Amino acid sequence: MRILILGAGKMGSFFTDVLSFQHETAVFDVDPKRLRFVYNTYRYTTLEEIEEFKPELVINAATVKYTLDAFHQVLPALPKDCIISDIASVKTGLKEFYDQCGFRYVSTHPMFGPTFANLDKLSTENAIIISEGDHLGKIFFKDLYQNLGLNIFEYTFDEHDETVAYSLSIPFVSTFVFAAVMKHQDAPGTTFKRHMKIAKGVLSEDDYLLQEILFNPRTPAQVEGIRTELNELLDIINKKDCLLYTSPSPRDGATS
């Protein structure tokens, strides 16, 4: 299959590495310097090159801020029978775009990234495939993610957004609070060091991604839940009430 990957960033390079030995791949990026670090693939910077390549599948690996812009830029150069796809973690506006774009589509969310995941060992990681997508496109990504050892779930766009609001907003907000109140420690304990490592990783994420997660309409309810639990915990601490305190544990089905 001829596969065009949009964006030569970390995830774009990852998908290129995974796919280039079994498929004919090309990577498109408006910044030629970013293409220096992708191998065993065609490297494109113009729409004319895309037209000549005639991709059968497009994987949009641009950062969240530019996902829709990248689609709009390349659509005129694509064959009408091409399947377009995204791997965005935040899918704001994508369903509306797909409904009117005139192309078959598939939308997925590999729920791992280069910040924390070991990309060589993904058996503990998850991926979501959006159920509204094209049947053949979903089969392609299901096979790909199974070969990577990922745990696969199929959700609607709405179910995906609800899951992301829970699984991303809670740890991100908790990390922001930790980073805001923590002080430098010359001799930190193990737990502190682990939290600090996570905080540095989260705060190094793309600013637009953090904004989209925080401003997700479903995020305020999750933050309210955190505030309620903190208020109850503070009340227990102030009263020194051992009977009220029970060590919290992850709820069934919760993931970190």
Regions found by a protein language model. Give the residues of each.
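An accessory alpha-helical subdomain
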Residues: 154-247
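NAD(P)+-binding Rossmann beta1-loop-alpha1 motif at the extreme N-terminus of oxidoreductases
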Residues: 1-42
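Active-site regions of enzymes building and remodeling cell-envelope glycoconjugates
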Residues: 39-47, 102-105
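Rossmann-fold dinucleotide-binding core
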Residues: 90, 94, 98-151
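Rossmann-like NAD(P)-binding element
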Residues: 49-71
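Single conserved hydrophobic/aromatic residue that forms the stacking wall/gate
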Residues: 245-256
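ADP-ribose/adenylate-binding Rossmann-like module
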Residues: 78-93
